């Protein structure tokens, strides 16, 4: 069977150095750092792709498992790991498989934290995946999801001057992203509800890419530190975070009641 994600993986990997992707990974990494247990905690990155989030975590001493259904993505992760020092390589494990079946694929292992960034938007219903993420966590473990913000789909086309598209997006639940794929958005309220159903307490949510999402394939400039700080501050305060392109939600699995 071929890799259904091959073309998407190619487009995603080729966009890795542009501003919007740099901001995505830097901002989610900063938000995540406020909630993760200390290294060498064990983390599983569901849909972790080429290791954009996992490899920096491994550099900090975390033991990270990437599980991804795309052989193309995992091959890219291997290439990136080959450029790292031996200690970083030893702390990253690559596994082929889907998030929904990750608990089974990983032999029932549980982890201190589970990441699922940029995956929910490709699913018709996020709740089965969120239940699967919860199953991967030990009690008290931290879950981090990154989803498309359903309440802000009109922002990008409007800021790009595509006003008819923006008008249509005001009541839409889906749009076509930069990678050319039509994907679905979630609201913060719906994600909070899905967390509760899965036995996860929501801790904090952040908006990712408030002021820069309409800039297309622009590369980072010398002002990147200022842009990062602006996006970070806006992404954790109202009303700005509510119009961000992406929602970064962090929660903790509730302890087992004795």
Where in this protein do the model-derived segments appear?
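Short alpha-helix
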Residues: 181-199, 205
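Conserved SAM-binding motif I beta-strand of class I
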Residues: 64-68
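Conserved class I S-adenosyl-L-methionine
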Residues: 1-47, 52, 56, 73-76, 142-170, ...
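A short glycine-rich, Lys/Arg-flanked "PGG" loop and its adjoining helix->strand segment in the class I
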Residues: 127-142
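A conserved beta-strand element that flanks and buttresses the S-adenosyl-L-methionine
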Residues: 115
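A C-terminal cap/extension of S-adenosyl-L-methionine-dependent methyltransferases
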Residues: 204-258
